């Protein structure tokens, strides 16, 4: 693969390799740096500010621009993205924590083009907050290795870690992911249907999200399409926009049932979500909480490790479907050095972690 100019900036002064040189925490290969756990301190933090401003705030003035230039720049670039990704390698439907983790893992291969479809204006799903609108995010070990790879600090406990604010995870993974040249996020865009050819999912039917929500009030609002070699459905649990991928598969007879997720059981749920992440029909992989809907697995509540690892597993399943090296088949770069602690426990484990 040709070298690319995009680089990561370390927390230290040492330069880091280009993004595709970073090794995945999914298959246990070494990564470029680790972030130490947060040390709790009761001292007031100090903020240092530069004594020299890059501009004079008293007399600040922008360079002139024509309004039409702004319009043309936005329109031209978006239309070129639509043309580029009208036929792509992977389409990920849903930009929650599982979908973003999947896209991040896929984007390490610069030869794979990844389009992300998100019906909301703001991607991230429920990963902007922890449970009950609280801010902290709990991640059970060993999924914290993914946080190390992303460079996210956390408070380390015996069997889990806690991120100060869930938004730190979501904003960090998005900032790294969306900077990569082989990824495009189409937010405020809904996947209204699937493209199916000869019993294989071959893409998605798209429309502006606001149009999708108003088909009953307007007429003649036909959709667009996006062909893909692989579709990853990461639509979350059941709801107005949830589990839409598997519900559509049922309605067209490609699967028999969508029983819905069972009551909460964290210790069973997270392992089950990762284990059951798979290609459910030819051309379509299901990841995240949508897995619980199709398999009747328990809901997990406000823990997020399974979303991250399920997304990574979905990425490697997609790589396998594309004929690329992947951790599922063990032919991914340095995959043979998988660390034992990255192999999740069996779903039937009886161990319960209590803070």
From Swiss-Prot:
Subunit structure: Homooctamer.
Species this chain originates from: Vitis vinifera (Grape)
Entry-linked InterPro entries: FAD/NAD-bd_sf (IPR036188), Sti35 (IPR027495), Thi4_fam (IPR002922)
Top-level taxon in the UniProt lineage: Eukaryota
EC number: 2.4.2.60
Protein name, UniProt field: Thiamine thiazole synthase 2, chloroplastic
One example GO MF annotation: iron ion binding
Pfam families in alphabetical order: Thi4 (PF01946)
Cofactor binding remark: Binds 1 Fe cation per subunit.
Keyword Transcription: no
Chain's gene name: THI1-2
Any one Gene Ontology cellular component term annotated for this protein: chloroplast stroma
């Amino acid at each position: 693969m040709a070298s690319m100019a995009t680089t990561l900036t370390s927390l230290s002064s040492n330069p880091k390799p280009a993004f595709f040189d970073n090794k995945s925490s999914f298959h246990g290969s070494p990564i470029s740096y680790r972030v130490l756990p947060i040390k709790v301190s009761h001292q007031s933090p100090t903020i240092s500010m530069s004594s020299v401003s890059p501009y004079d705030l008293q007399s600040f003035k922008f360079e002139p621009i024509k309004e039409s230039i702004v319009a043309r720049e936005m329109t031209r670039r978006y239309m070129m993205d639509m043309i580029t990704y009208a036929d792509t390698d992977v389409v990920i439907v849903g930009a929650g924590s599982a979908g973003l983790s999947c896209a991040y893992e896929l984007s390490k291969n610069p030869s794979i083009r990844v389009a992300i479809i998100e019906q909301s204006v703001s991607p991230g799903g429920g990963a902007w907050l922890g449970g009950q609108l609280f801010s902290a995010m709990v991640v059970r070990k060993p999924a914290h290795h993914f946080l190390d790879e992303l460079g996210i600090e956390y408070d380390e406990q015996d069997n889990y870690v806690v991120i100060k604010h869930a938004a730190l995870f979501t904003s960090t993974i998005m900032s790294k992911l969306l900077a990569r040249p082989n990824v495009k996020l189409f937010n405020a865009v809904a996947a209204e249907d699937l493209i199916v050819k000869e019993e294989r999912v071959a893409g998605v039917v798209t429309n502006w999200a606001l149009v999708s929500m108003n088909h009953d009030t307007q007429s003649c609002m036909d959709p667009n399409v996006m062909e893909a070699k692989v579709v990853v459905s990461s639509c979350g649990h059941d709801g107005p926009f949830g589990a839409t991928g598997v519900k559509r598969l049922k309605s067209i007879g490609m699967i028999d049932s969508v029983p819905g997720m069972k009551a909460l059981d964290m210790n069973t749920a997270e392992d089950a979500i990762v284990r059951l992440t798979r290609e459910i029909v030819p051309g379509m992989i299901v990841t995240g909480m949508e897995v619980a809907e199709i398999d009747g697995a328990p809901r997990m509540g406000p823990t997020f490790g399974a979303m991250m690892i399920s997304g990574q597993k979905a990425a490697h399943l997609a790589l396998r479907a594309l004929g690329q090296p992947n951790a599922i088949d063990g032919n991914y770069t340095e995959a043979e050095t998988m660390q034992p602690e990255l192999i999740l426990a069996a779903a039937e484990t009886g161990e319960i972690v209590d803070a």
